[in-house]
């Protein structure tokens, strides 16, 4: 009985916090499907990540807040391809794919949707279902990040960018090292819209150290110079959190 009572209190506290969250309230007012839109918006505003006319791949897109922001940011220009293992309500101007990014056939469908276009930016909000076992959760998260990096190496323009979500803790240093091996510039990020108590953090990599043939062969014209990378606030991340 005590366990159930405590569980109800925890759930009520979370619900109260969620309802009163200024980003949740703002998302409702501005028509975003989730508060996560403001994480991407903050990163974009600080670092100049997204530009009209870009081709962007949104991994782990459901419920669609990042894709919504991308579509609004790019207006009617460019292309957005959204993928998630969970179904997502359609969004005008967004190609939505349903499937597990870890499956080869799903990656093939994603490549078919690109129709030969090279990608300016890949954003990934993918995260595994957490088991509470730190080493297992870290391994699952690492698998998703590594797949996103591998996809980016094949499809990004030489000066393209990859933004991924990950959790600060076990395995973080290895993934940061992978980014430094892959990209010319790497910035760790903790947007203000990310909850203070959460171990959620982001890594942004820009400029492939070894450009893929796809990017070199398919670029149209001269790519714009990438905006300088400036950390949001501080680069220090909380080691623990929800």
Curated annotation (Swiss-Prot):
Q: Does the keyword Ligase apply?
A: no
Pfam families named in the record = FtsJ (PF01728)
Q: Does the keyword Ribosomal protein apply?
A: no
Q: Specify the protein name.
A: Ribosomal RNA large subunit methyltransferase E
Region: Disordered; residue ranges are 198-242
Quote the cellular component terms of the Gene Ontology held in the record. cytoplasm
**Which reactions does this protein catalyse?**
uridine(2552) in 23S rRNA + S-adenosyl-L-methionine = 2'-O-methyluridine(2552) in 23S rRNA + S-adenosyl-L-homocysteine + H(+)
**For S-adenosyl-L-methionine, which residues are the binding ones?**
64, 66, 84, 100, 125
User: Which family does the UniProt entry place this protein in?
Assistant: Belongs to the class I-like SAM-binding methyltransferase superfamily. RNA methyltransferase RlmE family.
Query: InterPro entries attached here?
Result: RNA_methyltr_RlmE, RNA_MeTrfase_FtsJ_dom, rRNA-MeTfrase_E, SAM-dependent_MTases_sf
Where is this protein localized, as stated in its record? Cytoplasm
* EC class (word): transferase
- Give EC number(s), comma-separated: 2.1.1.166
């Amino acid at each position: 009985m005590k366990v159930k009572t405590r569980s109800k209190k925890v759930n009520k506290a979370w619900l109260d916090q969620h309802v009163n969250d200024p980003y949740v309230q703002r998302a409702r007012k501005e028509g975003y499907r989730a508060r996560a839109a403001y994480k991407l918006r903050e990163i974009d505003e600080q670092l100049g990540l997204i530009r009209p006319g870009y081709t962007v791949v949104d991994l782990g897109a459901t419920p669609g807040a990042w894709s919504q922001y991308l579509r609004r940011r790019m207006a009617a220009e460019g292309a957005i391809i959204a993928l998630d293992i969970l179904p997502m309500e359609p969004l005008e101007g967004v190609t939505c794919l349903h499937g597990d990014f870890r499956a080869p056939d799903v990656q093939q469908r994603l490549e078919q949707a690109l129709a030969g276009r090279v990608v300016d930016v890949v954003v990934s909000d993918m995260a595994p279902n957490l088991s509470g076992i730190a080493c297992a959760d870290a391994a699952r998260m690492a698998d998703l990040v590594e797949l996103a990096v591998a996809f980016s190496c094949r499809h990004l323009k030489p000066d393209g960018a990859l933004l991924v979500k990950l959790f600060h803790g076990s395995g973080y240093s290895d993934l940061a090292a992978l980014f430094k091996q892959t990209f010319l510039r790497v910035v760790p990020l903790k947007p203000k819209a990310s909850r203070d108590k959460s171990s959620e953090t982001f890594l942004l990599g820009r400029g492939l150290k070894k450009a893929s043939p796809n990017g070199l062969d398919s670029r149209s014209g001269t790519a714009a110079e990438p905006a300088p990378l400036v950390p949001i606030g501080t680069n220090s991340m909380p080691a623990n959190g929800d």
